[in-house]
């Protein structure tokens, strides 16, 4: 049921959805089942099956938690509330290296014959490794201080955050192209009236 799925998402803490989005999507939820017999669905399914197979067959020696903690420290230290170009570039390289090491050296116990919590966590951390790199790439692209994020190169002489509405009055949407470093930026301009 939809209620059970919603509870699973909340319990899993994998999805964050602002309250206002529910109303926005309400009409779309009632559109009925979406057909999955398109080639894109089959390709996505094959990619996931291959990823699961590779994770389970990998004979690494490091836990998923090992990688999760390292990624968290990279994001916290180099892509947190206060950011600068040097550390963002370092974060991107470190995350790329961490992701490569993850796929080479992670150990995921169990099988895919039934629900496997370590496998689910490994898949989640694999997503976080991609999202973390894209997060740093997006922060590197946006060279202004805005909202709760302080770009050290974009501040007044008094040390206050300095916005750049001339160049950054847009919403960023990144198109997945395979790996985060090749993601394509799409800008949706904002106009306030």
Task: List each language-model region with its residue ranges.
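Glycine- and aromatic-enriched mobile tails/lids
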Residues: 4-7, 11-193
